[in-house]
């Protein structure tokens, strides 16, 4: 799947989103990470985290398994990096 990935698409992901993606990559596969833990690992504020997660979901680099739930001030309950997200980071990171 990474073969069809355009590096320009990855470069368009802003630095905040890359910071979140890198933080998520430190956790085990399949582990769901809540916004507060992302905040602790990155130092980003909730608004920045929400925007980054939205961008990463659109790029298929992360998933929000239960999109109908959220845990304010975050627009999601938990998030996990996809295998595709890990591959992109490994190759282009």
Language model regions located:
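Long, compositionally biased intrinsically disordered regions
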Residues: 1-3, 37, 91
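Short alpha-helical segments that sit at the start of domains
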Residues: 1-21
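Short, locally clustered residues in the helix-turn-helix/winged-helix DNA-binding domain
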Residues: 22-29
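Short acidic, hydrophobic short linear motifs in intrinsically disordered regions
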Residues: 29-41
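Short amphipathic alpha-helical interaction segments
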Residues: 43-59, 76
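A short, conserved structural fragment
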Residues: 57-69
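Short, solvent-exposed loop/turn segments that connect beta-strands within catalytic domains
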Residues: 70-75
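Short, amphipathic alpha-helical interaction segments positioned at domain boundaries
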Residues: 77-93
């Amino acid at each position: 799947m990474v073969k069809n990935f355009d590096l320009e698409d990855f470069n368009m992901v802003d630095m905040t989103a890359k910071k979140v993606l890198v933080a998520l990559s430190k956790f085990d596969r399949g582990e769901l990470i809540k916004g507060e833990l992302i905040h602790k690992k990155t130092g980003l504020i909730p608004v920045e985290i929400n925007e980054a997660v939205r961008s990463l979901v659109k790029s298929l680099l992360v998933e929000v398994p239960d999109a109908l739930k959220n845990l304010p001030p975050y627009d999601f309950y938990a998030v996990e990096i996809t295998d595709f997200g890990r591959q992109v980071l490994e190759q282009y990171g």
